Every structure is written in structure tokens, then in C-alpha cells.
């Protein structure tokens, strides 16, 4: 198989629950061409966006918000959310980097992990509902199209957030009994500045060209959120691992949705922003 096709296929095997199959050869190719992350995000965004579009025509808003969340985790799995809970436990641990890393890697779910996981899910739900509430006032009958755009932008932003935090991060020290790099370290090693830039340009293009400012501003905000998370990971652990990269996915998605909701609110109050939806 062509190396680009293998990397693209492996992106779905690695980042989604879609049963395309994955191998170590495929993972190696994906890490060499890790700019496929936002490409996979774009395909996921089209799929989840279509569900949001159709659902907005059928279901009450609160039901659709829950359905969208369920769709996201059905297609992407809970691995990244598991990273959020691990990061929460690590953040809440007291003491040195070593003690915090121990809490980070502990398989037992603690209070910090539960709290962080709940906050992320509540923020996810609340951001979708805010877009629905503000969007009906700005777009009226075009609200289904706004929901499609929002979920597309959110998934592209989520995957580019992973690429962003990996590109600027350094891996945590490898345990002495671990001879080979884990997936987090492989992701960081693959996220070269060149690969980051290719992914960033692709994501900016597909978010801005069809959707204008409603696409670009949330996308950029999600990338910034990844850098903020990286700063906190350095402060608590002295580096970055796969849990942090997975958390960047969740935080990036939510950041994009929140910024869309805030921008809609500002547009409604000021009337000063121009919107482009396809």
C-alpha cells in the first residue's frame, strides 16, 4: 500500500473506533506523516456534522446535544477522555514532579480525575447548548447548517490541538524498564515543525474557506488552548505524555465550541461581525 494511504488509513485506526485495522507499520507511517491528524478530524467532522445537521431538524435541543456527545465518543472512543481523568489526578497530586507523575500513571481513578472528567463533559454539553441558543437568534432557520459547521470546526480543531501540543512538547523521561517509546513519545517525535505547519495550514484552510471567521477564530483558540495545557503539563510533570496529548483533543474541541458560542453572542450584541456559511 502507498505510504500516504497507509498513514491516512492508520489515522482512522489510531484516532477513531472505525474498524479499518492498524499495524505497527501503519503507526510508523502515521507518525512520519502526522499532519494527517487534522485530515482525519475533517472526515470525522463531516460525519458528526451531518448527524448534528439532521438531528437539529428532528430532535429537541437538549436531546440533540446529548446525541452529538454520544456520536463523538462512539466514533472516537473514550481513550482521550481517559487521558483527561489521568491528567486531573496528576494535577491534584501534591509534591514533586515524580509524585505527580506517579499519580498521572496510576490506573486507579481519583477525585481529581472524576472532577476533571465531569467538568469536561459538562463544558462539552454546555457549549453545544449555547451554540443552539445563540445560533437560533443569529441564523434562524439556518441553525442546522450552523450545527454542522460547529461540529466540523470542533473536530478539526481537536485534532490540530493534539498536533500542536505534541509539536511544542518534550516527552516525559522513559521508565528504566521501558526499552521502546510509547505512543505519546512517538507522537511527540513525529510532530516536527514541518509536520505541524502542514497540519496547521490544512486545518486553517478547511475551517476558514467555507465558514469565514466562525471557522478560523475557534480553530486558532483551540491551538492556543493546547499551548496553555502544555504549560500546565510542564509545571506539574516537567514534560508531556500521551495523556496530555489526549487531553488537548478534548480541551481543543470544547474551546472551539465555546468560542463559536461567544462569537455568536458578540455578533448578536454588536452586529459587527460578518458570517460566511458555505
Swiss-Prot record:
Q: Give the membrane topology.
A: Multi-pass membrane protein
Gene Ontology cellular component annotations, sorted alphabetically:
plasma membrane
Q: Where in the cell is it found?
A: Cell membrane
* Entry keyword set: Cell membrane, Cobalamin biosynthesis, Magnesium, Membrane, Transferase, Transmembrane, Transmembrane helix
Which cofactors does this protein require?
Answer: Mg(2+)
Kindly indicate whether the keyword Methyltransferase belongs to this entry: no
Q: Name one GO biological process term.
A: cobalamin biosynthetic process
Q: Which GO terms describe its molecular function?
A: adenosylcobinamide-GDP ribazoletransferase activity; cobalamin 5'-phosphate synthase activity
Q: What does this protein do?
A: Joins adenosylcobinamide-GDP and alpha-ribazole to generate adenosylcobalamin (Ado-cobalamin). Also synthesizes adenosylcobalamin 5'-phosphate from adenosylcobinamide-GDP and alpha-ribazole 5'-phosphate.
The name this protein goes by in its record? Adenosylcobinamide-GDP ribazoletransferase
Source organism per entry reads Methanosarcina acetivorans (strain ATCC 35395 / DSM 2834 / JCM 12185 / C2A)
Amino acid at each position: 500500500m502507498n505510504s500516504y494511504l497507509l498513514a491516512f488509513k492508520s489515522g482512522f485506526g489510531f484516532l477513531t473506533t472505525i474498524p479499518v485495522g492498524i499495524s505497527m507499520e501503519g503507526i510508523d507511517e502515521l507518525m512520519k506523516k502526522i499532519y494527517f491528524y487534522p485530515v482525519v478530524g475533517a472526515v470525522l467532522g463531516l460525519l458528526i456534522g451531518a448527524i448534528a445537521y439532521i438531528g437539529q431538524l428532528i430532535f429537541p435541543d437538549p436531546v440533540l446535544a446529548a446525541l452529538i456527545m454520544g456520536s463523538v465518543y462512539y466514533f472516537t472512543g473514550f481513550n482521550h477522555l481517559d487521558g483527561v481523568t489521568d491528567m486531573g489526578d496528576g494535577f491534584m497530586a501534591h509534591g514533586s514532579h515524580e509524585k505527580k507523575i506517579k499519580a498521572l500513571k496510576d490506573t486507579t481513578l481519583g477525585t481529581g480525575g472524576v472532577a476533571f472528567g465531569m467538568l469536561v463533559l459538562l463544558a462539552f454539553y454546555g457549549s453545544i447548548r449555547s451554540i443552539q441558543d445563540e445560533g437560533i437568534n443569529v441564523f434562524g432557520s439556518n441553525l442546522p447548517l450552523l450545527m454542522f459547521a460547529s461540529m466540523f470546526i470542533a473536530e478539526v480543531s481537536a485534532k490540530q490541538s493534539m498536533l500542536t501540543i505534541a509539536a511544542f512538547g518534550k516527552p516525559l523521561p522513559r521508565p528504566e524498564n521501558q526499552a521502546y517509546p510509547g505512543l505519546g513519545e512517538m507522537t511527540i517525535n513525529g510532530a516536527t515543525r514541518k509536520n505541524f505547519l502542514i497540519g496547521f495550514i490544512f486545518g486553517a484552510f478547511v475551517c476558514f474557506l467555507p465558514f469565514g471567521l466562525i471557522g478560523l477564530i475557534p480553530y486558532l483558540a483551540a491551538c492556543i488552548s493546547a499551548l496553555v495545557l502544555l504549560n500546565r503539563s510542564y509545571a506539574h510533570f516537567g514534560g508531556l505524555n500521551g495523556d496530555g496529548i489526549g487531553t488537548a483533543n478534548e480541551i481543543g474541541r470544547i474551546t472551539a465550541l465555546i468560542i463559536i458560542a461567544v462569537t455568536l453572542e458578540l455578533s448578536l450584541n454588536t452586529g459587527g461581525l460578518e458570517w460566511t456559511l458555505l
